[in-house]
Amino acid sequence: MSVTAAADIQLTASGRLRHFLTIEGLSRELLTRIMDTAESFAGVTAQNVKKVPLLRGKTVVNLFFENSTRTRTTFELAAKRLSADVLNINIATSATSKGESLLDTIRNLEAMHVDMFVVRHAQSGAAHFIARHVAPHISVLNAGDGRHAHPTQAMLDVFTIRRAKGGFAGLKVAIVGDILHSRVARSEIWALNTLGVDEVRVVAPKTLLPAHVEALGVVPYHDLNEGLRDVDVVIMLRLQLERMGSAFIPSEHEYFQRFGLTEKRLEKARPDVIVMHPGPINRGIEIDSAIADGPRSVILQQVTHGIAVRMAVMSMAMHAGPDLEVPV
């Protein structure tokens, strides 16, 4: 789907959010509005009573055709903290395991008068496909589709960066690891460039970079020490071994020797660098435990921020607009 078509299906005629499928094609103003709304919800999640009534009476269906811990759980928590009713469909025991098509599954759930689908699927474009076929009152959020996009992960990451750094101007960001198979990397590149960082670097072996990667608006590096030099933010990615064969890297041990983040290598970055990882972490393969658990790591803050960001996106999509007053 083209950028224009993707943007058109995501937004109402007045330019407000209806679906959240990809960051590609969305404006800086809209991404900023999502973060500003998430900032309001961040205070709610720290209260004793962590609920607001914005989505009371609404029903959210989590449709995860791929395994997930953080994403599914934070979407569920986000919906419940907005007072929505949540259905988690067990794909292994659902009618899809008996051969029911994706569209038939959606139509049957639609007949139960649900209001939102949160979809994770191994097939790129699955969330777009669903969004094109649902009733006008239903919103679709993409929780990851194939290699294509993971927009809420990218939004919680840029929200974490904004909170740590105060903004995006002048920042140099290095994304390190399996860029080729990563939907997170693509969404983060779109978000970071839209928000105006100074430079986005991608650091990986040649076998784990897409062809013509420069067209995405990034600077490629094949040497980690050089790629980390003077950066403000490091985003580590896991090797997606389930999506690759043996030809991509010689071995996990050799990969760590060349591209694993260690304290020594991190010295090349700026003194106030922050280290991020969307999870799950493979310690000793892409990152050393001393870094993952160290003072520069904001990995657990990313998880916390994921709830507020997903609350923001759900509220904006359900209300067909970002102008919300968050009760506190």
Swiss-Prot record:
UniProt-annotated binding residues for L-aspartate: K98, R183, R238
Biochemical pathway: Pyrimidine metabolism; UMP biosynthesis via de novo pathway; (S)-dihydroorotate from bicarbonate: step 2/3
Highest taxon in the source lineage: Bacteria
One BP term from GO: 'de novo' pyrimidine nucleobase biosynthetic process
Gene Ontology CC: cytosol
Signal peptide region: none
EC numbers on record: 2.1.3.2
Enzyme class (EC, first level): transferase
Entry keywords, A to Z: Pyrimidine biosynthesis, Transferase
Catalytic activity: carbamoyl phosphate + L-aspartate = N-carbamoyl-L-aspartate + phosphate + H(+)
Binding site for carbamoyl phosphate: R70, T71, R120, H150, Q153, G279, P280
UniProt-recorded Gene Ontology molecular function terms: amino acid binding; aspartate carbamoyltransferase activity
Family: Belongs to the aspartate/ornithine carbamoyltransferase superfamily. ATCase family.
Chain's role: Catalyzes the condensation of carbamoyl phosphate and aspartate to form carbamoyl aspartate and inorganic phosphate, the committed step in the de novo pyrimidine nucleotide biosynthesis pathway.
Record's subunit section: Heterododecamer (2C3:3R2) of six catalytic PyrB chains organized as two trimers (C3), and six regulatory PyrI chains organized as three dimers (R2).
Protein name: Aspartate carbamoyltransferase catalytic subunit
UniProt organism field: Methylococcus capsulatus (strain ATCC 33009 / NCIMB 11132 / Bath)
